[in-house]
Amino acid sequence: MCIRDRHTVTERSPSLIPMETEERWVSRAAGLDLRNVSMKLMCGGKAVYEDFGELLFTAYGVGGPTILSASAHIPAMEPGKYSVVIDLKPALSEKQLDARILRDFGERKGMRFADSLRGLLPAQLAPVVAELSGIPADKKVDEVTKEQRRELGRLLKGLTVHIRGFRPVEEAIITRGGVSVKEINPNTMESRLCPGLYFAGEIIDCDGYTGGFNLQIAFATAYSAALAVSQA
């Protein structure tokens, strides 16, 4: 009763959670764990979060460490409001990537375009990118135009998926929200408003990214609260 009547409590919501996408092609790449890719979480044409690392394609959308961290930057999920732009070749500029593609095509003259991408992309993703590029799969690589090649490069640097929503809350690593930290003594975790009331873990409006930070918050707040209670 004291919590509800006197404390400021932010509504609970899932965080560090995989996302579902509008695009169905992701299911064809399900299970593919991309490493060393860059991603941007976009909202209204602006990047609200950027990250580099691992990204996982799933049967329903996207997951993995970068996506889980990105989910923490979505205060309220609205279908169609957010998108994720993936740079599959972040180490290369568009010019460098175009030179790489041109070199690969030169080494594979007479090969089908769709087959030529297997040296550039994971086998599971290559046919998807080939289809998204709009270049006919059976077209010989030496027949691909300069503009088509550059469009392919732009696709590789900006593969975009549109977010439909979060996965079920049961799949979230944590929930965010809870009792305001301003109303809790950080040394003892005791309520500043209700003496004798202590808080720990996810009931507090305090959370972090993946990587053990939330476990540390839980352990540290629980230890502080238990120590304070034992000495009260």
Describe the predicted segments one by one:
Residues P127-D207:
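A glycine-rich dinucleotide-binding beta-alpha-beta segment and adjacent secondary-structure elements
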Residues I67-L68, R150-G153, K157, F219-L227:
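Predominant activation on well-ordered alpha-helical scaffold segments within soluble catalytic domains
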Residues G63-T66, V179-S180, I203, T210-N214:
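Gly/Ser/Thr-rich beta-alpha loop segments that engage phosphate groups in nucleotides
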Residues M1-D5:
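Conserved small/polar residues in nucleotide/adenosyl-binding loops
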Residues C206-A232:
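A conserved FAD-binding loop/helix module that cradles the flavin
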Residues H7-E143:
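An anion/pyrophosphate-binding glycine-rich loop and adjacent beta-alpha core
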Residues T21-E22, T175, L227:
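Short Asp/Glu-rich motifs
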Residues R6-R12, G158, F166:
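Short, compositionally biased leader-like segments
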